[in-house]
Amino acid sequence: MQRPTTPLRRSNSRQSDHEEHYPIVESVLDMAIGEQMAELADGMSALDRNLKDLQVIHTNLNNFNESFSTLIYGLQMNAWCAEFHNGPRSCDFARRKEVEEMEERARRAQMQAERDRMAMQQIQETPTRLPSEPSDGDVTYMRNDNSFIIQPPSSYQSQLPSRIPQSSRASRIRPPNSLRPPRGRGLYLRGGSRGVTGGRGSYTGVGRGSGRPASEGTTRRWL
């Protein structure tokens, strides 16, 4: 039994038709694009060389970046872990504290100077009042401190009349009676052998101030 035959593809038929109607001459093709293709091949080879050189440069840069980054990282770790000048130390903290204290003192001094300036400006703007002379009332009050009532002068004491009448004052002064025996026990003689005994009594002096000496205003009285 024979297999059925299949017809040829149309592409093959078209190619055959094209070759039949438009024949290709190899000599003409080589002359037309041969030089351009040679130049293109030279450019592609140069591009390939340049890309290879660029790849080498990129590889070298990556190696340098890795090495340099490792060096920087090691220096940073050394600054924080070992005695490195860039790392903070105890003296750095003390110096920082001193700087902060100096800044605080400068700020306080500036504020004090500003307050003093404002106070001086306020004093200059306030009108000054001249001291006025004391009035008569003030002078009288000041002179009353040494008044004649507290310390009366001697001339005033001598001119001051006595308020006690002369008659009543004379009647009150009684001289002692020599005929009247003084009261008390043991004043009379009781027998010749016992003698004279003195009686009890009191001697009082009453004085009244009337601007006279003490001898004139003193009354002696036996009780």
Curated annotation (Swiss-Prot):
Belongs to the DASH complex DAM1 family. Residues 94-125 form a coiled coil. Residues 1-21, 114-223 are annotated as: Disordered. This is DASH complex subunit DAM1. Residues 151-162, 180-191 have a biased composition (Low complexity). Residues 192-210 have a biased composition (Gly residues). InterPro entries: DASH_Dam1. Residues 1-14 have a biased composition (Polar residues). One of its GO terms (cellular component) is cytoplasm. The keyword Chloroplast does not apply. Component of the DASH complex that connects microtubules with kinetochores and couples microtubule depolymerisation to chromosome movement; it is involved in retrieving kinetochores to the spindle poles before their re-orientation on the spindle in early mitosis and allows microtubule depolymerization to pull chromosomes apart and resist detachment during anaphase. Component of the DASH complex consisting of ASK1, DAD1, DAD2, DAD3, DAD4, DAM1, DUO1, HSK3, SPC19 and SPC34, with a stoichiometry of one copy of each subunit per complex. Multiple DASH complexes oligomerize to form a ring that encircles spindle microtubules and organizes the rod-like NDC80 complexes of the outer kinetochore. DASH complex oligomerization strengthens microtubule attachments. Within the complex, DAM1 and DUO1 may form the microtubule connections. On cytoplasmic microtubules, DASH complexes appear to form patches instead of rings. It comes from Yarrowia lipolytica (strain CLIB 122 / E 150). It is found in: Nucleus; Cytoplasm, Cytoskeleton, Spindle; Chromosome, Centromere, Kinetochore.
